[in-house]
């Protein structure tokens, strides 16, 4: 591969799917001159992906981890309420429930959950959330049904280094994000497919640029790039494979690859399905090599935390909008990527109805 091309994808920035709005921080009085952040919910509908009526509601919660009590205190009043020390913000994806009830009541039910947590470790530092108590309406959620969820601490806890390895820890839900989407449209690409490589393959990557609304004085800007129009983040996602040769064994030209990619009729959006995520929809025909990267309805979900945990955690509390999306064709092995130029293809739609909205569990 001796040259490079980029396919720029068109998107409508006015659509809700091109934005992810943050939760506004609202303080409420709780007496004695104290205030706390008011619980809030956010609802996003993704019916623009398909016409299916078999909708599910994906539930993502954001809240805070507290340490309950003090192990070092051995004497005290029995009537005293144990002290709750705020340690860090966190995210817990519960899974989905059928879209058959009142969504506001569903969000309210999440606030009544009793969840404890503790640290663990495998090849990565883990946070294990245990569901002690949950309302009936949430029982079909995967995490509630399993009674626990073990997640990567770096991806799901704002400051995992602040979480001790002992003591009683409690996760308190404060923000609930509900995304209504046809169930079959939420498709997370198998890790095995993402690791496939070969000299006879081209990798298709999505270069996504996201504008982030952030106070210039916030420490969050240290993790973002700056332009005349504000701050932004770049993401690089692996979205598929294509063969370097055709059925006759002849080398496939970049022009032919571009035509194949444009026939996919790709569109891209932002949503909160498995945490802040980039959603990709291919409305055109998909080749055999592309099949593992999309659901039967042509959709794929890319949690931003897998590409950049730091950017994903910024989007927990900041409004984000798609700025640009490009498809980049790269060589099929990492060694070849290192020594060859890339190829950009430019024509992908941005679903403007996809937004991550304002919600700020821990705005700095």
UniProtKB/Swiss-Prot annotation:
Belongs to the morbillivirus/respirovirus/rubulavirus M protein family. This is Matrix protein. One of its GO terms (biological process) is viral budding via host ESCRT complex. The M protein has a crucial role in virus assembly and interacts with the RNP complex as well as with the viral membrane. A motif (FPIV motif) lies at residues 23-26. Keywords: Host-virus interaction, Viral budding, Viral budding via the host ESCRT complexes, Viral envelope protein, Viral matrix protein, Viral release from host cell, Virion. It is found in: Virion. Late-budding domains (L domains) are short sequence motifs essential for viral particle budding. They recruit proteins of the host ESCRT machinery (Endosomal Sorting Complex Required for Transport) or ESCRT-associated proteins. The matrix protein contains one L domain: a FPIV motif. Transmembrane segments: none annotated. Its main location: virion. One of its GO terms (cellular component) is viral envelope. One of its GO terms (molecular function) is identical protein binding. It comes from the Viruses.
